[in-house]
UniProtKB/Swiss-Prot annotation:
A Gene Ontology molecular function term of the record: glutamate racemase activity
GO biological process, one term: cell wall organization
Gene it is expressed from: murI
The protein's Enzyme Commission number: 5.1.1.3
InterPro entries: Asp/Glu/hydantoin_racemase (IPR015942), Asp/Glu_race (IPR001920), Asp/Glu_racemase_AS_1 (IPR018187), Asp/Glu_racemase_AS_2 (IPR033134), Glu_race (IPR004391)
Active site per UniProt: 77, 188
Keyword entries, A-Z: Cell shape, Cell wall biogenesis/degradation, Isomerase, Peptidoglycan synthesis
Biological role stated in the UniProt entry: Provides the (R)-glutamate required for cell wall biosynthesis.
Family according to the record: Belongs to the aspartate/glutamate racemases family.
Protein name: Glutamate racemase
Pfam name, any one: Asp_Glu_race
Top-level taxonomic group: Bacteria
Keyword Isomerase among UniProt keywords: yes
Residues that hold substrate according to the record: 14-15, 46-47, 78-79, 189-190
Length: 260
């Protein structure tokens, strides 16, 4: 039974395609594990929904992954983590559930001076969880919350470097370019897919950080703690599902995760 558990897949869930940026890091750091990814593109973006709606959709997604035999769950969505992680952990006590939050701590530690911009959805920035982070790390440094409604939709449509998304990001970031910005935190798992465009706008001196590595390290720790890590020496399997039953979205998912 324990061997079956070790070989069971790890479930990843996001409001759409964004969580693939976290899954990509997991495939790099733990290639021998099996994975299931569920993207809820039918209901994306979550950032404009109420906390109650986000919780309901998150429970549906977790149920899907558990029915597929997931041994652990990664909520690869900042918005869903903020709104639903606590309730999900209370309900599913027997399964490790790992969330993701804006990587504000490492961003602050990287530099002694300069402001930090946190790009995220409105829902993430409005949640108590983010306000607590602001209270903790924003005491001695300027932290600028930057809601980006509309950016997720570009990425869900596969527009990662077109003129429209470039103009959108310029409009968002240009007002801050006369300040000393040390770091930008990507507080939504969709945003790493446009990291290069953001870097071009802000310049190479600004560090751009996301929470993927920290989340995968925590996943690894929890699996080891529960004796659930795969002992296979082979590369694991990956199955991708999406609530939007559209061939194009699955093709885009594979492209984003660089599956040949």
């Amino acid at each position: 039974m324990q061997d079956d558990l070790k070989n069971a897949p790890i479930g990843f869930f996001d409001s759409g395609l964004g969580g693939l940026s976290v899954l990509r890091k997991a495939l790099e750091m733990m290639p021998n594990e099996n994975y299931i990814y569920y993207g809820d593109s039918k209901h994306a973006p979550y950032g404009e929904k109420t906390p109650q709606e986000i919780r309901s959709l998150s429970f549906n997604a977790i149920e899907f992954l558990i029915k597929k035999g997931a041994k652990a769950i990664v909520i690869a969505c900042n918005t869903a983590t903020s709104a639903a992680a606590h309730d999900l952990r209370e309900y599913y006590k027997d399964i490790p559930i790992i969330g993701i939050e804006p990587a504000l701590k490492p961003a602050i530690k990287l530099h002694e001076t300069g402001s930090v911009i946190v790009m995220a959805t409105k829902a993430t920035l409005n949640q108590e969880k983010f306000k607590n982070l602001m209270d903790k790390y924003g005491e001695h440094r300027e932290v600028i919350p930057l809601p980006c409604p509309g950016l997720v939709e570009f990425i869900e449509a596969g527009d990662l470097e077109g003129e429209d998304v470039k103009n959108f990001l310029r409009e968002k970031l240009n007002p801050y370019m006369d300040r000393e910005i040390s770091s930008i935190v990507l507080g939504c798992t969709h945003y790493p897919f446009v990291k290069d465009v953001i870097q071009d706008i802000v310049g190479e001196k600004v560090d751009i950080i996301d929470g993927s590595s920290g989340t995968v390290r925590e996943l690894k720790r929890r699996l080891e703690e529960n004796n659930m890590e795969s002992e296979s020496k082979k590369k694991g399997n990956l199955d991708i599902f999406n609530s939007l039953e559209d061939k194009k979205i699955l093709e885009l998912s594979k492209k984003l995760i660089e599956i040949k």
